[in-house]
Amino acid sequence: MSLRSLLITTEAVGETTQTSDHQTSFSTRTYNEINDRPSLRIEKDGEKAYCFKNLDPVRYDTRMGEYPFDYGGQSTENNQLQFDLFTKDLKADTDIDLSDDVKDDLKRQIMEYYQQGYRAIFLVRPQNQEQHYIASYSSTNLNFTSQPSIGVNLSILNKIQENKLYIYSTQPHIPSVGCEMIAKIFRTDIDNENSLINYSAPVTVTISVTKATFGDTFVCNHPNMNYQDLIPTMTKNSIYHDVKRITKIHEYINSKKKKKNSTSKIGGIQIAESKDGFWKILTKNYQIKLKFGVEGYGVMGGTFGNWLIDSGFKTVETNYEYQRNGKTINATTVASVKPSRKCGTRSPVFGQLQFSGEMMVLSHNDILTVFYTEREWALSNAIYAKNFATDFKRQFEITAQSDELLVRTNVVPHTIKNTPGKALMEYSHGGFGQIDTSDYTGMALTFRFRCISEDLPEGYYDRDKALAFANVGLTSFQDRQEANGTYWVYNTSTVGFGSCYPKKEFEYDINVTYTTLLPSDPEFTTGGTNYAQSVTAVLEESFINLQNQVNEMLTRMNISDLTSGVMSVFSVATSFPQILDGISDLLKAASSAFKKVKGKVGSVAKRLRGKRYVRLFDENVSIEETPRFLDSIRSSRRPSILSNMFNDDETFTALHTLASRTNSVASDVTYLQPIITTRIANSTPPVIAPASSVTYAKLKDISKIINAEIDPKSIMEFNQISNTISILDSTKKLAQYAVDPDIIDGILNKMVGGHARSLFSLKVRKHLLDAVEKDAFVKYNYHDLMGKLLNDRELLDITNNLSSQKQFELAKEFRDLLINALA
């Protein structure tokens, strides 16, 4: 995977996102239907700068979003994911029996589907997601009860073999919620005929089948299902319960049958862990306390300070503590609102002694983004994170009192008529991001809440709806009530929550699940010597010889703020070492390192990515399906003309390989930390793509800008650093055009695919090729010329032909990239 592609998920909620159920479902990996791209956002707030270089996600719902599956091998088409066999709403504290016909039919269907490669899912969803509940099974010879649970729980029949059932569960204890239904259907003891199941809260039970596969399992005996006879014994990547070793735990089971109130324990559950090569992939479930604030501001101006000249919402940082598993958790959230509408009237004709102004409003479809992080957790040390999911479905309302308005006039009585309005918020989607707060810089979870308040025009409404409108300078509606009980709402009012009100705090307990990529060797985080010797020993001498050249180049380029480590490691890792004099020896060493890691990262790449859509993934690292989460991945299926550019696995692996610290060079080289590599990954290197990869509408827009038709055979470069578009047409003419940055962003957001990120711009590639073959643009036809111009390996071999001046010119361009990356 490309450096940017792999690490973008540390800042982009787009790669792993869960969306709410009310949104539309789409099939995935359908290029004709996928034409929206996320946009780049940067926010700044007063004295602090919060760098959210995120890509807004493109979301594709499937029915499997709430299930924490591992890796399935089938399509994520909705009609292939899951088949429901049984659904029933059950009342609280009511003994429930299933008829023999229903049990036999369900067992028959499950077994038939199992023979076809399907697994059975036993899902229990409480009507109240915040309520604790337990599930129980009772018969003459067997009784068991689950531990108190909250939210959706499921048990999955992963395998049936030798009269044993292999069951995956989202709960860490046995028996889990869902086992009561499994026992009811599969238990063959005659005692099962009179058995009953019971739930302490109203629930909906759903039994379905899927071809997805799952993580850890526990094993129980098929005929008697006696969970009391099970004890856990650990094996690699699974929990196995040996039925041959009988340990009675009646007291424990019976104690759980007593229904009693209990407080929620905020804990973490490790769902799965696996090692593959250099990496460890960890899937965990946490219960976190999300506490955040929404705070507005208003600025009065004008000659006498009676005009509202500015308003909006602050970026609010909240630091707090809470308990989880007996430990104190220090957490930080950063909440920001992006309002899109206003209320009130800006009328200078009123005069300087009267109020005039408009107030920003959090209104229909506006987004509230909350970033959450903890001081000490696995995510903070992760290189990569994906597969974010949460069970949070709750809606909440943001409102205030009219007398809380923050702004005042300088005219007696110093008050301004207003109505704060109301904003109804609902969880929309989430993922991962990178934040810079007052005391933390690193990875964070993101939660995005969408305002679902109705978008209503002026008119007559009942009082409750009228109070949902915000206004300033006037109340939102007339005081006089009409005969039918309605009130007239002014056209200066807007449905939503006004911005000129003090901080409103919210606090919720939320379950989250995510997958992280960590080094399998703990030493690898700082560069284990053994690992470095196995892969990078060939580079050590070259690095040492390079230091003087690096320092000289830094002096010449006047960028002393960039360390030699940044320049040397990043230049080699991103295949741009030709900017330095005498670099050929290091290139050979780097090539050797590439060969050593080649083939060792492919399976890791497959484990990291599903068929869901994220910007700029190489198609040649396509991996199996991960149907449990909702976004589909957009992969850049490279056309043959781009096939010789470096692939993503090579670039990413090289960076982390070369960042290994060794004793021989540790005192001389300062290596990149993960947070720095993330910033570099998001430094938006140029995008190179054939014109056919750009949407027809965008090509027309570009044609208007440059006042020329674009040859459909052209190769195009979109450079977000220099804000230029370069076009190399079939006549071998290379032209560069300066354009507005919004235009480039808009084009990239609509890119159909078939593109590649590269630190070689077309201009640089032309210089490199000219250095070895001055007449290359003359003697080669267009097709052959493109084969040479877009071949990274051939370009690496010609660096000895560059003059110092030519290398210096190329270095200046690369310097701009680094400065942009580390700004």
From Swiss-Prot:
Fetch the InterPro entries from UniProt. Answer: Rota_A_VP4 (IPR042546), Rota_VP4_MID (IPR035330), Rota_VP4_MID_sf (IPR038017)
GO cellular component, alphabetical, reads:
host cell endoplasmic reticulum-Golgi intermediate compartment; host cell plasma membrane; host cell rough endoplasmic reticulum; membrane; viral outer capsid
Residues flagged as site, Probable cleavage = 245-246, 260-261
What is any Pfam family matched here?
Answer: Rota_VP4_MID
Q: Which domain of life is it from?
A: Viruses
The protein's organism comes out as Rotavirus X (strain RVX/Human/China/NADRV-J19/1997/GXP[X])
For this entry, the protein name equals Outer capsid protein VP4
Name any Gene Ontology BP term.
virion attachment to host cell
